[in-house]
Amino acid sequence: HHLKQVPVAVERREPVEVVSGDRDLFQVVRSEPTPVQVVYVGRGLAKAETIGPAELANRYGLPEAGAGPGYADLAALRGDPSDGLPGVPGIGEKTAATLISRFGSMEGLLAALDDPQSALAAGIRAKLRAARDYLELAPSVVRVATDAPVRKDRDDTLPAEPADPAALTALQQKWGLGTAVDRLVAALAAHR
């Protein structure tokens, strides 16, 4: 599993929004059994984007069904220098997306590589063959864990007001938080 990330537990009952500036988490995007979207803040909060299966498919040329897992396979093929993944030499993002779209997954692509009758072009086949060891290992590094246990032992709804207004006021004054805390309290009250 992806070594850089804290494992992401995808709740199985309610829609999930993952807020992150790391595109690696695009792989958890899905429609079913429960919707999962990534609120991508990699270019700052003011430019936050909500990425669901349709947006992921449009951005990277992947099929909408399975766009999340397809993104992980695309990343393994094209490489990701920030994660130390070299990718397959000569396979860029567009070719990777085409291969994942055509063969469905890394597993499907490797099966096509092993099948001399498959529709793989000779040049692509040679590049993939040369990187076979990498292709068998990369998915286990790229994929994030989605099965971490999630304890729901507290109410996760936003409070309508601070639990201890006096303590909050003391912290606000001590740290000079002024209007930031006032805006937070107003936002909580408005969210009721």
For every predicted segment, state its role.
Residues 130, 140-192:
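Low-complexity, acidic/Ser/Thr- and charged residue-rich accessory regions of DNA metabolism proteins
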Residues 1-151:
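Extended two-metal-dependent nuclease catalytic cores across DNA- and RNA-processing enzymes
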